[in-house]
């Protein structure tokens, strides 16, 4: 396949055209007065979204060089979304502004490598300044404000997320699901819940609710199958003497062992129930260990030289209550020591930081939530499926932004924080490095300009008003059209979102600026196929 090569200004200009087209599609969604983008789907109804990364992912350009530029900035949006959960439109708008401003200077003769070095120094100083002016999130009111802004000024979503975080804590898992009605709902499951139900309906104690309810039970944890009753007898005899209920969590319980447990339950000899251990393979072992730490027990494991026959009451965990239905088991108020639980939580956090797999990260976060004290489920309601999907995207964004705010703190929102931080950064640079720093400073106005423009205000006037103000909390409220104290007005952004958006935007823009050649496949115009031979149509000779 023949290749097409472009050099220097020709290459960069065509890359810029792709970046511009992507930016033009994404930037209209920015701010509280941002517009919707309608996206055609290969099947079904088109989707409507105000989510920057959803728009960016759909942009594929016909020209291969332009598409290379667009795909690099598309990666900026996607990476920002993965790292911070929000700020995708900010990152796209910044990347375009930096590339546009940089291209003008490089075309005029500036050295792109020196320009890049100056840009990197300016960004490092800006990030330090953002951290200096950041405030810690102090309560559910600020959490609600952050979530509201990220959900495109939907206060009901902000309140839902604030309530969810208040109930399960900042490390708790909050999941988003589609509701079966048009109303939004918040359901909270306290304690540790895992997706395994009772092994036999004969264990049920509450026939009305069809669930097993155990009060102050002992909890036996075993990492293998239990088939032989003889292995279980010693611990069952000890349990019977205490008169307390027993929950057995094992890989499986079958045959003679399960039948005997059911008979003893029905005869009232033992108040007992059994469930399969959650997860598979190594994850099952880890989750059994989590349950052991939460309940103050030990996992009876043959790998550690322990047999089921050797189990004593000291090896068993305890909890204030256990509720089991056909699908789930919930352990409430485990008797484990707080120091041991905290150590386990820190261990899982370290694993989350190290893993590169999204799947592993998700499963580790689920384990973290179960240990931290609960799971909240936000059920999003809407009148139509299209509206439901759009709203669910906004809730996901708001949830990610809220977590980012709790993690690194908050700064003034509405595109003002980057401008205010840049006024406080004074670097002693010269030559093309100084040009690089100035390119970044100029580009930092772009998010505020776009927010004002989308809201129907004069972008130049708004940007200038914020730039000349000496008040670090000063900014523009695009909803009311007023200049306000942004913290008092509740217009705030997570530092992490601003930081990640800026870092990723500068990273890709500087790569584009230092590009000196592009190589792409040359699209060949294929000739039209020849008309087929019509010789077989002799029977039509009578036509005039």
From Swiss-Prot:
Record bears the keyword Cytoplasm? yes
Please classify the protein's predominant subcellular localization into one broad category.
cytoplasm
* Subcellular location as annotated: Cytoplasm
What PROSITE patterns does the entry give? CHAPERONINS_CPN60 (PS00296)
Which top EC class is named for this enzyme in its record? isomerase
Task: Write the Enzyme Commission number(s) for this entry.
Answer: 5.6.1.7
* A GO term for molecular function: unfolded protein binding
Q: Which InterPro entries match?
A: Chaperonin_Cpn60_CS (IPR018370), Cpn60/GroEL (IPR001844), Cpn60/GroEL/TCP-1 (IPR002423), GroEL-like_apical_dom_sf (IPR027409), GROEL-like_equatorial_sf (IPR027413), TCP-1-like_intermed_sf (IPR027410)
Q: Name one Pfam family in it.
A: Cpn60_TCP1
- Which superkingdom is the protein from? Bacteria
Which amino acid positions bind ATP, per UniProt? 29-32, 50, 86-90, 414, 477-479, 493
**Catalysed reactions, semicolon-separated:** ATP + H2O + a folded polypeptide = ADP + phosphate + an unfolded polypeptide
- GO biological process, any: protein refolding
Query: What CDD domains does the annotation carry?
Result: GroEL
Query: Key word Disulfide bond present in the record?
Result: no
For this UniProt entry, what's an example GO CC term?
Answer: cytoplasm
Q: Which UniProt keywords apply?
A: ATP-binding, Chaperone, Cytoplasm, Isomerase, Nucleotide-binding
Its subunit composition reads: Forms a cylinder of 14 subunits composed of two heptameric rings stacked back-to-back. Interacts with the co-chaperonin GroES.
**Assigned protein family:** Belongs to the chaperonin (HSP60) family.
Function recorded in the entry: Together with its co-chaperonin GroES, plays an essential role in assisting protein folding. The GroEL-GroES system forms a nano-cage that allows encapsulation of the non-native substrate proteins and provides a physical environment optimized to promote and accelerate protein folding.
Q: What is this protein called?
A: Chaperonin GroEL
What species was this sequence derived from?
Answer: Campylobacter curvus (strain 525.92)
């Amino acid at each position: 396949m023949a290749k097409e090569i472009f050099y220097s200004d020709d290459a960069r200009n065509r890359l810029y055209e792709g970046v511009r087209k992507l930016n033009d599609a994404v930037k209209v969604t920015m701010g509280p007065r941002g517009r919707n983008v309608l996206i055609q789907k290969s099947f079904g109804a088109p989707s409507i979204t105000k989510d920057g990364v959803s728009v960016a992912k759909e942009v594929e350009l016909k020209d291969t060089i332009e598409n290379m530029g667009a795909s690099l900035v598309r990666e900026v949006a996607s990476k920002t979304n993965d790292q911070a959960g929000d700020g995708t439109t900010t990152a796209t708008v910044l990347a375009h502004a930096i590339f546009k401003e940089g291209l003008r200077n490089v075309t005029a003769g500036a050295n792109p490598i020196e320009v890049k070095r100056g840009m990197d120094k300016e960004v490092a100083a800006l990030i330090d300044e953002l951290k200096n002016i950041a405030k810690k999130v102090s309560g559910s009111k600020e959490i609600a404000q952050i979530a509201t802004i990220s959900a495109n000024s939907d206060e009901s979503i902000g309140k839902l997320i604030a309530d969810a975080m208040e109930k399960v804590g900042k490390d708790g898992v909050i999941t988003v699901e589609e509701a079966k009605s048009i109303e939004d709902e918040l359901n909270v499951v306290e304690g540790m819940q895992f997706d395994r139900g009772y092994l036999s309906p004969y264990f049920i104690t509450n026939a009305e609710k069809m669930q097993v309810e155990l009060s102050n039970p002992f909890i036996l944890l075993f990492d293998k199958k239990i088939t032989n009753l003889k292995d279980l007898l010693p611990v069952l005899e000890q349990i019977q003497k205490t008169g307390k209920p027993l929950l057995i969590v094992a890989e499986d319980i079958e045959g003679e062992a399960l039948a005997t447990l059911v008979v003893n339950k029905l005869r009232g000899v033992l108040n007992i129930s059994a469930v399969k251990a959650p997860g598979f393979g190594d994850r099952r072992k880890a989750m059994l260990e989590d349950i052991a730490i939460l309940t103050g027990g030990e996992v009876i494991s043959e790998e550690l030289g322990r047999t089921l026959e050797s189990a004593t009451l000291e090896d068993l965990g305890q909890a204030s209550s256990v509720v089991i239905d056909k699908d789930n088991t919930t352990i409430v108020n485990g008797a484990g020591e707080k120091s041991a639980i905290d150590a386990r939580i820190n261990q899982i956090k370290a694993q989350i930081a190290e893993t590169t797999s999204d799947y592993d990260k998700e499963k580790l976060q689920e384990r973290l939530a179960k240990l931290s004290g609960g799971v909240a489920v936000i059920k999003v309601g809407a009148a139509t499926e299209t509206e439901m999907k759009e709203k669910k995207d906004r809730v996901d964004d708001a949830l990610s932004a809220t977590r980012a705010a709790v993690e690194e703190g908050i700064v003034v929102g509405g595109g003002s924080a980057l401008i205010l931080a840049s006024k406080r950064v004074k670097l002693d640079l010269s030559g093309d490095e100084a040009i690089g720093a100035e390119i970044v400073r100029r580009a930092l106005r772009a998010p505020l300009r776009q927010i004002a423009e989308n809201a129907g205000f004069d972008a130049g006037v708004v940007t200038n008003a914020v730039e000349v103000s000496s008040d670090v909390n000063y900014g523009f409220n695009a909803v009311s059209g007023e200049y306000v104290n942004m913290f008092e007005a509740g217009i705030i952004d997570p530092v992490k979102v601003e930081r990640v958006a800026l870092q990723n935007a500068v990273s890709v823009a500087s790569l584009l600026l230092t590009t000196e050649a592009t190589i792409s496949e040359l699209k060949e115009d294929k000739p039209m196929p020849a008309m087929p031979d019509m010789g077989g149509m002799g029977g039509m000779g009578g036509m005039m």
